[in-house]
């Protein structure tokens, strides 16, 4: 009986892919708690993909903290410290994998950046539920309005 309930829950929960724009939201000014973030996202379903994208300047301590919270640390290269890097491109390409993955139902982007608007639009065109989590200042209004949640 318990096993049947567990099987039912596993089979009916949506599968979620989470992509975190590290350089954009993991900053001292925002004090992002990855554990709390994961718990909030689990309300949308089972997290099957959880990646935090970082640039090559990310400290070992930060990478360790990300991994200990159950996320994969994905390093993108390029750009100068404190300037634009290829992290956005790397994250967008990975998110597009989820858009075309039939096993993913919900795509969550944690960013403030309007550069990810095409990902949200393409995800919705392909029947995915979309969630954007961000913070002020600088949280793109267009991104917020385009997402389902």
Model regions: which residues?
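Domain-level signal for Mg2+-assisted phosphodiester chemistry and nucleotide/NA-binding surfaces
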Residues: 1-90, 100, 129, 137-138
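Receiver (REC) domain switch/active-site residues of two-component response regulators
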Residues: 148-149
